[in-house]
């Protein structure tokens, strides 16, 4: 007596692979009697429950019975025995091909799920800024100093943030960071670079602030200066500060 559990399968080959894995059958040496019996049990169970059976399942059932019958025929000892075609060969080839296809599909689905954990931002159109007058940067600090300051902020922030971070769809934009800098400069003509941070920001917010400062500096909205190496970095209003506000 057999216990049959009806699962959802994507066609007869999917059902055969399920049975092969369930009963730990060697796909290269399939015992046709056992596999055919299990397959037919599934077909009979569907009929008993009055479930419509797709014609492709019945076609494969006929094929299994034919292969089983051929394997039961007596084998005559001849010099050509080694060249006799195994009646299972075509079925095995199709099963292996389907198995490879299924594994590759699962792999692609995993990649898709991983990609869905990331959120992309489309490039910002800055073409309207091309005509804005740029300012003389002869007294600006070296970009290396600004990058070093960014690294110090990131290092200090890492001690105040949890190791596990929940991904949220709400992102901190360059426009928001630029607005914060502009609002601080509206109150004071000069602000300290490090005053922009609470050191509780996540990496995304730090990077966004950094990119906003670079963009504002490039377009002359702010000016960045440093009295000497490793000293505080000061941000002041640039020649284009307030234009278009």
Curated annotation (Swiss-Prot):
An annotated GO cellular component: cytoplasm
Keyword annotations: Cell cycle, Cell division, Chromosome partition, Cytoplasm
Source domain of life: Bacteria
GO-annotated biological processes: cell division; chromosome segregation; DNA replication
Disulfide bridge positions per record: none
Pfam families referenced in this protein's UniProt entry, alphabetically: SMC_ScpA
Quaternary structure and interacting proteins, as annotated: Component of a cohesin-like complex composed of ScpA, ScpB and the Smc homodimer, in which ScpA and ScpB bind to the head domain of Smc. The presence of the three proteins is required for the association of the complex with DNA.
Family: Belongs to the ScpA family.
Function text: Participates in chromosomal partition during cell division. May act via the formation of a condensin-like complex containing Smc and ScpB that pull DNA away from mid-cell into both cell halves.
Protein name, per record: Segregation and condensation protein A
UniProt gene name: scpA
